[in-house]
């Protein structure tokens, strides 16, 4: 186990305990950044992923609930959602934090819900920014080259509005896999007044606009990702009574075969020691899963073996690979945007 804390106790305490203020970020690289949490190494193979001495660097703070990061090669920056602020922020080396898009997920004028903004972000093969939008209850596409604004990709299934699309991933053919839990509804999971679909589904949207319900068996589906060969779909379930990651074999037509539990952290989630539940996840080129969950980011082999954890000590929403050479893991951890250096 390797443990790293902020270089000064007062700074560490402020990172973990002070209420969120206006978002802020460093724009220089002269002074070492504060660090958060600890890195736990559980398998020798972890050193081939995260180099010894790596730290969880804090890039931005003062956020409400950071989520859904994605690296934009075109911008040379990471984009991420602040769901309660209804904003997509951009963080770029040397420039720090700026507002990229507001409103991001709810375009109405009346208060809708506490979590009305965008959540998961990704890019499709055409380079469009795909956004899961809570308040507008849709998937949208935005061209970074300008012109046309946002385009709604889907906002209903069989004539009924989605709950609050949460996370998405895209395959090489442009099919979008996304989850639809109820967290963005005005009353959250307990909402029966505005809810139209009685289940929390996992869906597939084709480039032609056809939507297929893949499964409704999960109580609270959340993060979603594909294996490198696109033959397995991973789905996180953020249910305290069944906190787990599922692995579903994909048929050639995009439908799912019966899934299996890849990893179960129900006991960990219910212990009271760790904050958070299975949430967003990404898969690296070797097939390892980098999955946010109780305590931070769980790094697992394709077989579900836990290799190590990036413990933030706070609820952690999602992560993504980024940098010019994909040399960093960017982490959305509650009020902070962080990153960890990876082995190239």
Residue ranges and their predicted role:
Residues 22-26:
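Sec/Tat signal peptide C-region and signal peptidase I cleavage site
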Residues 1-6:
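N-terminal secretory signal peptides that target proteins for export/translocation
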Residues 27-344:
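Sequence-structural signature of mature extracellular/luminal beta-sheet repeat domains
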Residues 7-20:
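Bacterial N-terminal signal peptides
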């Amino acid at each position: 186990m390797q443990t790293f804390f902020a270089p000064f106790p007062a700074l560490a305490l402020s990172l973990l305990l002070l209420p969120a203020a206006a978002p802020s970020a460093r724009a220089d690289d002269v002074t070492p950044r504060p660090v958060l949490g600890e890195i736990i190494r559980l398998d020798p193979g972890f050193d081939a992923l995260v180099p010894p001495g790596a730290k969880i660097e804090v890039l931005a703070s003062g956020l409400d609930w950071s989520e859904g990061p994605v690296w934009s090669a075109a911008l040379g920056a990471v984009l991420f959602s602040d769901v309660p602020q209804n904003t997509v922020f951009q963080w770029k080396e040397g420039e720090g934090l700026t507002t990229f898009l507001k409103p991001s997920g709810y375009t109405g004028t009346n208060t809708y819900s506490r979590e009305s903004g965008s959540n998961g972000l990704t890019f499709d093969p055409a380079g469009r920014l795909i956004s899961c939008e809570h308040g507008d209850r849709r998937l949208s596409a935005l061209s970074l080259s300008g012109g046309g604004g946002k385009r709604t990709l889907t906002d209903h299934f069989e004539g009924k509005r989605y709950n609050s699309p949460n996370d998405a991933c895209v395959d090489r053919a442009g099919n979008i896999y996304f989850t639809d839990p109820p967290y963005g509804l005005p009353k959250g999971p307990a909402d029966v007044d505005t809810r139209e679909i009685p289940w929390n589904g996992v869906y597939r949207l084709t480039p032609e606009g056809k939507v297929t319900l893949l499964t409704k068996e999960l109580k609270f589906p959340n993060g979603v990702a594909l294996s490198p060969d696109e033959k397995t779909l991973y789905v996180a379930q953020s249910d305290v009574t069944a906190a787990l990651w599922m692995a579903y074999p994909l048929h050639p037509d995009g439908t799912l075969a019966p899934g299996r539990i890849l990893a179960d952290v129900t006991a960990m989630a219910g212990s009271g020691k760790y904050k958070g539940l299975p949430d967003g996840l990404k898969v690296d080129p070797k097939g390892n899963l980098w999955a946010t969950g109780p305590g931070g980011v769980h790094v697992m082999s394709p077989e579900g073996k836990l290799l190590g954890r990036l413990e933030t000590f706070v609820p952690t929403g999602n992560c993504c690979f980024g940098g010019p050479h994909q040399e960093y893991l960017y982490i959305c951890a509650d009020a902070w945007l962080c990153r960890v250096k990876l082995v190239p």
